[in-house]
């Protein structure tokens, strides 16, 4: 069987789940990462050093490797690798969304322009340089508005402003974040600009889907029961199946398919964030990759198939017996960071696991490591997973478990 090229960052949460899925399928894996892996010398055919920021040399390296060791599919685990995955797949003639479509989805400003031009419901928006003055753009967009970095993923750097003073404070804070050497180096030209959008009220959901030949299969629709109204937009709880009325769920699926089509996305996984209000669904973000962090552990299909196995089967052209999610409701809480500092201790995990419905608790930040909350931070303290008969019972279990955890010994950094 031909190899799978899995493109990941060395800091990825997602690599393990894809490697496990490949192991279940008996598919050999080549891991492509921006830095050499620790065991690369012991297994030279199992890894490639690929810098997503140097696209042409990275694609050439993949093509040269594939000439000696055939590759049957290319999958990116995270946002940083999706354009490289698309370009490598195109060079090898493999099944994947096009580079142009993936790049359009990755560029928040370009995505907004495409959607507005095709008549899809979109907020007012403007792009501006971090060296500029946001007040003129805000006069065109209006208040309340949301500042979004073009170079960062998820909710990092995203802030709401209800008036000019809040706008200037948020803009200064975001410009400072984007000017950090590591962010500027990773983001390139995108790190020098931000997007200003009119704020969209409504309940927020996340749709996990798989595109095949332009057809969208909805794998799961997650409710986000905690209001996401700003000033920062920290996601905490995801619960599926959604409790929205069926017509609303259908409208969300239709809107997502329309956005994917407008961008040219036609193959592979997508993770979409939408808001639903009295005017209907509004696309917030759509990413040409699967759900982030460890959140995919909430999803099982057919006879216990993981999301990652489903994605790999699609990419490799293998049979998929069922796209149906399991009967039980499931959910995850991404444990928020209450304040900046150094994590000195975490307690209450034994008590939290005793809550009915809780399946797993993982604290992913090592003791002694510095933690930073949103909008500057890029991670969570960990994850809580639950299953139950109803979405309501799952949400209640997640909240009860979180209440039993204690991170009250987060102290100031460099003490």
What are these regions (language model features)?
Residues 336-367:
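Glycine-rich active-site loop/lid that clamps phosphate-bearing ligands
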Residues 159, 169-173, 197, 204-226, ...:
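Beta-strand scaffold of nucleotide-dependent catalytic cores
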Residues 1-101, 129-132, 363-381, 385-412:
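ATP-binding N-terminal substructure of ATP-dependent carboxylate-amine bond-forming enzymes
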Residues 90-157, 164, 176, 180-182:
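A conserved helix-loop-beta module that forms one wall/lid of the active-site cleft
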